[in-house]
Amino acid sequence: MAPLQSYIHCSSEKGLSSVTTLVVGDKAAVLFDPPFLIPDAESVVQWIKKTTNVPLRAVFVTHHHPDHYFSANPILDAWPTSTLHAAPYVCAGIDREYDEKVIYWPTLFGKENIPAAPRKPIPFEYTFFQLEGNEDSPIILLGPLQGDSVDHTLFWLPKEKVVVCGDSVYARSTHAW
């Protein structure tokens, strides 16, 4: 078994420059933090198709902010057997703010850029998972941790020494909130 490979995709500046991470194994892939805006999600779909031919099995969300899950719809539509997940405490944060955010964000970015009904993740109750074909490379959920919210999940790939960190680490810019 080859080690898991990780790739990143940066969204547009309009989409708050959020980073989406794709982890690809021998027989399956998983995506972390789908983007905020529909055009960015459509770009992610094309990027995944260019990057790998293995099926996308799941999409995970690091925390409850909309720029990390709002436009999962086009991605899940492209891979209809894929599921959207988050740690239970992340799902609780999404539930707490969902109705308000669904009304607010289209007023700023336009209804053409924000899904009318963003899909909500289902709670992932486990501390790790494995991709088919790469059972020797677990992906471990760490959290809740403090990122730019108090309910952040990091995803640790110990064999590959990779961390998917969402908004717990910043590089070239400061987050808007």
Label the model's feature ranges.
Residues 1-9, 109-114, 134-139:
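Short Pro/Gly-enriched beta-strand edge/turn motifs at strand-loop
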Residues 2-50, 154-167:
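Conserved beta-strand hairpin/beta-sheet module of binuclear metal-dependent hydrolase folds
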Residues 11-13, 117-120, 143-146:
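Short Gly/Pro-enriched turn/cap motifs at secondary-structure boundaries
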Residues 17, 37-39, 64-69, 91-94, ...:
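Active-site environment of divalent metal-dependent phosphoester hydrolases
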Residues 22, 127-158:
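Core dinuclear metal-dependent hydrolase active-site scaffold
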Residues 30-33, 57-61, 140-141:
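Short catalytic-loop micro-motif centered on adjacent basic/acidic residues
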Residues 46-130:
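Active-site HxH/HxHxD metal-binding segment of metal-dependent hydrolases
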Residues 163-177:
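Signal/transit-peptide handling
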